[in-house]
Amino acid sequence: MGKKSEQSQKVYNEMAWEYDSAPEGRYTRPHKEEIMKKAVLRDGDNILDVACGNGYLLGELSKKAGVNAFGIDISENMIASARERYPACTFAASPCTPLSFENESMDVITVSCAFHHFETPQIFANECMRVLKKNGKVFIAEPFFSPVVRWLANTVVFPFSKTGDVKVYNQKELQLFFESAGFTEIES
């Protein structure tokens, strides 16, 4: 586990039980709700929520259809909170790479407001391609910022922050990770 992943783990372990009322929890809620609107699920689908936090997104998605719901997060305390809140879902403390799932085992993969914490984003995109079934979908909700804000975050703030933030990307950069992994149908 890299330095930034260790920082993320520490920060989210500390806020796990109060996440929904913390600024981070309130900020991420609309992004999660956007995924909930867009994700079309069928009974029997396998869903993986990466960096699932306290399980809110996965728990709500699992109510849309009779799905097999899996969530992973680097924070053990977030996973404990998720298990308590959504006992019908399966949760595990795990990093985002490598994904510990079989090839072509998932119908849907979601990531909400966490991609900027990933130390190896290209490896993550490759792993998504590996574990997704044919015609599977990845939903990523990530905030996009102006070039000036991105530059400040990436060169001034993140190198010195202790929150585990690695890099914020523009939409094209994010798209390129998935194109390089072999994804051909990418919507924004």
Give names to the regions the model predicted:
Residues 1-40, 56-60, 78-81:
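Conserved class I S-adenosyl-L-methionine
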Residues 4, 22-26, 57, 140-181, ...:
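C-terminal alpha-helical "lid/dimerization" subdomain adjacent to the S-adenosyl-L-methionine
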Residues 44, 106-107:
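Local beta-strand N-terminus motif with an aromatic residue
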Residues 46, 136-137:
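Short glycine-centered segments of the SAM/dcSAM-binding site in methyltransferase folds
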Residues 48-50, 54-98:
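Class I SAM-dependent methyltransferase SAM/SAH-binding core
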Residues 110:
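A conserved beta-strand element that flanks and buttresses the S-adenosyl-L-methionine
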Residues 113-114:
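Short catalytic micro-motifs in class I SAM-dependent methyltransferases
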Residues 122-134:
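A short glycine-rich, Lys/Arg-flanked "PGG" loop and its adjoining helix->strand segment in the class I
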